[in-house]
Amino acid sequence: MTAAVQSPVLPLLEKENVADIAIPEGDSTYWWRTSGQDLSRMLQEAGYPDEAKRQFLNYFRDTICPTLGGKPDSNALRTAVGWDGSPFEYSFEFKESTKSAGVRFVVDLTQLRPGDKSAPLTTKTTENVIESLSKKTPLFDDNWHRALSQWFVYSHAPESEQKALVAAAGYQTNIIMGFDINAKILDLAPGYLPIMAKSYFPPCFVAEAKGFTRWQALSLGIRQIPDIGSHPNILLALKLIEDYVAAKPELAGGARGLSTDFVKAGKARLKIYMRYLGDDFEEVWDYYTLGGKIPDLESDKEMFRDLMTLSSPSTYTEEDWKDTQVDPRRRAAFKTKPTAVYFSLSPDKPYPIPKVYFYPARAAPNDKVIARGLDAWLTKYNWHDGGKSVEERVESVFTHRKLEENPGIFTFIGLGRKEDSTKKGLSLQVYMTPELYVTPRF
């Protein structure tokens, strides 16, 4: 259906050739030469079909890269995604019931390089990408996205108010976009891109503007969706979370975001993202289960306990630290990254589907020991497919430094039940950031 479908498969760039290419300052090809190639290698490592790779990478190069502006420099405004300010975070998804890996990523498309000084909360660049998705992705529907935008986004506020909100929040991000690259779409909906998209909204601006807590901003953001009353299971699931937070009011400040899918109401989910400052596993587990109110989770408990050890300093030895270059800036940034919990609300369940995200870089000496810990976990629970390890895959994807040098590539490690009510089992998401602000590469 699109011209991109007819173009040849986009090749991986050889490392030695990339190093010889002069990237003009401000040229959007920078993003193709960095994140484009990272994602290309991820799709290769995950075994995606050539046609799915070609269609996605064409779209990424031709639509997403030009939106991102110039190469980051010392004056570049930070995004709300990567720990270093990078606009990208990628993930491999592994499932208990299947041996194939999936590839996802989120990107902050906010106009930051350069920024819009008179309208710092503009969403024009993000909306341009959403408009392109409306024509190229199957079952596209943005009604819930629009409803949430009216609540969370302050791009139409007066300039003085926008600047005050940015000063209070510490960043300019109204919306973050998420992409699930799904090759099955090529068979189920020929002619469309192999992409399912979602949008994420931080609560900070509406909380600041209206005097709410961040948790109130999220909860009320759901309740103000015009047709939400037609989906009683979503409201029942939300009430379980509201009751838990009401009993533990210290959790309200940990509200981090709300997302929805670009599909019609009745199929779309709403996902609530929370941070949790504690390190006690039993407390984390109580949060994950909402005090035991979410059914059928107890049998998974030891798998979560084992995964959480990757975030514990006691897990690592002097031998693990021997090759690490200690970077105080990184260590300070990682100390601010607590455990996270998300709750997915869907129209077909009266309770949320939860997931816990651990942040092993808070304690781990470097990325190599995190990768090996993940591989040991996958092997212990018989998830490893006998092919490449996580360590080998990640080393193939990220070529800008060695994993043993520092932590920072691995970010959150998420584990939780699948959301599809017809399927059982757990899914593991391994999040990674390309470190493009601290390591621009070119």
Curated annotation (Swiss-Prot):
<dbReference type="Pfam" id="PF11991">
    <property type="entry name" value="Trp_DMAT"/>
</dbReference>
<comment type="pathway">
    <text>Secondary metabolite biosynthesis; terpenoid biosynthesis.</text>
</comment>
<dbReference type="InterPro" id="IPR033964">
    <property type="entry name" value="Aro_prenylTrfase"/>
</dbReference>
<protein>
    <recommendedName>
        <fullName>DMATS-type prenyltransferase mfmD</fullName>
        <ecNumber>2.5.1.-</ecNumber>
    </recommendedName>
</protein>
<keyword id="KW-0808">Transferase</keyword>
<comment type="similarity">
    <text>Belongs to the tryptophan dimethylallyltransferase family.</text>
</comment>
<dbReference type="InterPro" id="IPR017795">
    <property type="entry name" value="Aro_prenylTrfase_DMATS"/>
</dbReference>
<comment type="function">
    <text>Prenyltransferase; part of the gene cluster that mediates the biosynthesis of the phthalide-terpenoid hybrid 11'-O-desmethylfendlerol. Within the pathway, mfmD is responsible for farnesylation of the cyclopolic acid intermediate via an O-prenylation reaction. The biosynthesis of 11'-O-desmethylfendlerol begins with the NR-PKS mfmB that forms 3,5-dimethylorsellinic acid (DMOA), which is then transformed into the phthalide 5,7-dihydroxy-4-(hydroxymethyl)-6-methylphthalide by the cytochrome P450 monooxygenase mfmA and the hydrolase mfmC.</text>
</comment>
